From Swiss-Prot:
Segments traversing the membrane: 16-36, 117-140
GO MF term set: protein-macromolecule adaptor activity
Keywords assigned by UniProt, alphabetized: Membrane, Peroxisome, Peroxisome biogenesis, Transmembrane, Transmembrane helix
Species name: Bos taurus (Bovine)
Lineage of producing organism: Eukaryota, Metazoa, Chordata, Craniata, Vertebrata
Name this protein carries in UniProt: Peroxisomal biogenesis factor 3
Subcellular localization, as worded in the UniProt entry: Peroxisome membrane
Xref: Pfam families: Peroxin-3
Amino acid sequence: MFRSTWNFLKRHKKKCIFLGTVLGGVYILGKYGQKKIREIQEREAAEYIAQARRQYHFESNQRTCNMTVLSMLPTLREALMQQLNSESLTALLKTRPSNKLEIWEDLKIISFTRSIVAVYSTCMLVVLLRVQLNIIGGYIYLDNAAVGKNGTTVLAPPDVQQQYLSSIQHLLGDGLTELITVIKQAVQKILGSVSLKHSLSLLDLEQKLKEIRDLVEQHKSSSWINNDGSKSLLCHYMMPDEETPLAVQACGLSPRDVTTIKLLNETRDMLESPDFSTVLNTCLSRGFSRLLDNMAEFFRPTEQDLQHGNSINSLSSVSLPLAKIIPIINGQIHSVCSETPSHFVQDLLMMEQVKDFAANVYEAFSTPQQLEK
């Protein structure tokens, strides 16, 4: 039997060699295919885990953003109430001074200015912190992902994070003071000549706020000018110009300072982007809409209006003398800058445009390939 098998193999030698080669190739290809499939599965699993880890870190970062905004609102409110102290004027009016009319005029300007600045600065705080914390969050994610790898340099050490995030103080300090000046001038121009006895409906009030916004957002600034000569919307209130104390030092910059300047420049690039401008404008529109909603409660028709059959759905059906509107607008700062989640702040924090923008910023700074560009 062995001899017959051997003779068969000798007679079909070439065929057997070919068959053996084919079977061997199939076996090798099968092993290679299994190895590649296993590698692909392992890579996909690693990518899925990395993506899940990054998504978890992103969501945690957004919660941090929200808590940071809420924690900073009392500081913002205190700064506004200190620089625009309407309470002292109100107390003065109770003493029945001889210049009562003059004090009322001052109270009119300060009350409107305070609430309008509160809307602007709160919207700026929400969007600016979204940018800053997602930039630094992206760096922290990359640092955490690189833990244990040889030759890796920490991108954002804690001291750099602290130095970078302290730049928010510009919005709460010099930026806020400049914003107050600009808005106060706009309020004076639009409402300065309006009599305290003049009645305004909610629709009239909306138009006045629009006129004030137009003046504020067209205000010229020596810095933050785009290449085409147009002004970047409101950016200089959120960050100082590029001549920062760190940047102007001729020598002696530490590695920490260099990294911080890099982060600030990246933030400045984000603030100058069309996406940032769009998101901020959307927040401002929502903010002023919510401000009017809050005030609408005081423009409800009276029993007499209802008896006369006046339309209760019209924004112009109820009017109030400006003197009665002043205390209403004056008190809005406590709703706008409330550290307890109010409808005003919640609306801003939960806006889809803000969430999408935050995701894009985080994506850009948590991806090594994007960061190297």
